[in-house]
From Swiss-Prot:
Binding site for ATP: G36, P37, N38, G39, I40, G41, K42, T43
Annotated Gene3D superfamilies: P-loop containing nucleotide triphosphate hydrolases (3.40.50.300)
Keyword annotations: ATP-binding, Cell inner membrane, Cell membrane, Cytochrome c-type biogenesis, Membrane, Nucleotide-binding, Translocase, Transport
Stated name of the protein: Cytochrome c biogenesis ATP-binding export protein CcmA
Species of origin: Paracoccus denitrificans (strain Pd 1222)
An annotated GO BP: cytochrome complex assembly
Single GO cellular component term: plasma membrane
Topological type in the membrane: Peripheral membrane protein
PROSITE patterns per UniProt: ABC_TRANSPORTER_1, ABC_TRANSPORTER_2, CCMA
Amino acid sequence: MNLLAVRDLAVARGGLRAVEGVCFNLNAGGALVLRGPNGIGKTTLLRTLAGLQPLVSGVIEAAPDAIAYAGHSDGLKPALTVTENLRFWAEIFGGRNIDAALEAMNLRDLANRPAHALSAGQKRRLGLARLMVTGRPVWLLDEPTVSLDRDSVALFAAMLRAHLGRGGAAVIATHIDLGLPEAEILELGPFRASELRRQSRPAGFNEAFG
């Protein structure tokens, strides 16, 4: 089942074209990893796919209400507790699975703590747990492991693999190995996207993600 299709997409940042020629199909259970140097346009591409900024040209096809985006901002309500934040987003998106989200990102012991009292890593875990309560099948993830320690990265990797196993899909900008050897890679170079290639299991692959 095709969840996201992109054809000859061009995106711009600050009025200047950043990347063009982006083409891919993302099916149920599929993952696409965006690679490229800092400033090449990965965030711009993800924001365009999420509908947060206009495309320059090309086509983006996705079912209505299919996409959930996790960017550099965690989107938390500081005065609300961890559980209340998840409930807020579940109500906004019409989703559920609050208990499962707490469990997935090891937030149960923090359930009643206000978001403003969380550490940077805890806030990031809550921001990622928010994805589970949206009910959206396509996750767009911009450097999702920032501020996470090794154990939290493993938790997120497990949550992501479970999402894919349930028929979800993801586009991820990351240089961290998340244990997705079946993922396709899209290398972004100056102004142009490369052909898709399969991710190979890298040397030093962390068996905790295998």
